[in-house]
Amino acid sequence: MKICSLLPSATEIVCSLGLEDQLVGISHVCDYPESVLKSDAVIITRRSSDLSGLSSQKIDEIIKFNREQKIATQIVDGDLLKKISPDVILTQELCYVCAVEYGAVCEITLDILDYQPKIVSLKPAGIQDILNNILLIADACDVIDEGNRVVDSIQTRIDFISNTLAQSNYKKGPKTFCIDWLNPLRNTGQWIPELIELAGGNEGLAEKNGKSREVSWSEVVDYDPDFIFSMPCAFPMYEVDSASRLAFSEVEQFNEINAVKKGQVYLFDGQVPSRHGPRFIDVLENFAAIMYPDLFNGLFNTGMYTKYSL
C-alpha cells in the first residue's frame, strides 16, 4: 500500500502503526520521527509564502492577508502527486494554516489523478478524537489490530495519571495559561485544555475542545495563573525562546503574575503540543510532572520543554 501524508500528525500516526516504509509522500513539515526525512518518501507540499525567521506578528499578518485574498497557505505539487500515485491520502480539516485543506486535496486529486484514492481527513477537537483518528488511519491502511495496540498503550498511560491524581486526593488544581500564539496573544484550544485538566490543572481562560481565541495580557494578569506554558504553534524550541522573551518583555505587569513570581513559566517545543498524533501523551505526562513533581517523579522531560528564566 502506498500512503501519502499531508500533515505531520498523520505521518506520526502512520509511523506509530509500523507503516513508515509504506509512506511514498509527505509534507514539507513532516519531521518526526527523524527517519522520515531520510526515507524514500517524496516531499510534495510547500508554503505559498516564506515564513522562516519572521516574527509572530509578521506571520500573522501574512496568513491573514493570504486568507483574505483566498491564497492557499500550503500547496500540493500535482506532478509529484501523480508520480507517486498513492492508494491512501491523509489530510485534514482542522487548520488552513498548518496543512493542506481537505477541499484542496479533493480538487487536485480529481484534476490530476485518473483514479480515486482513499482520502482520509482528520478534524480532531479532543483526545478521544485523536484516538479515533489513529484507529481510522489504521483501518484505512488495513492494520486495525496495530491501531488498537497503539490506542491501548496510550490509554494505559492516560489512566495512570488519572488514577494517581485520584488516589492522591488532590483538590482544585493550579490555574494554567497555555499560549498558542504570542502576537497577537492567543490561548490554546482543542485538546490542550483537556490535557491540562487530565494533568490536574485548570485552563480557566480556554474552552475544552473549543477553538483558540485572542486574549489580552490584561486578562491574563487578572486571571493570575500559577503556571504559564508558552507553546506557539509550530515554533521550534529556539524560536519559542526568542519569541517568548520578546513578548514577555513588552508586558508591563508580567513580573506581577503569580507564575512568574514563583518561577513557574515553561517554554514548550511548539512543534509537539500542536500536533494531534500519538505524542500528545508525552505532552500530558510533562504537564503532570511539572504541576505535580512529587506524584510524577518518574515522568521525565523528553526534551520537550525548558524552564523560562529572566
How should each PLM-predicted stretch be described?
Residues M1-L310:
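N-terminal ligand-binding lobe of clamshell/alpha-beta domains
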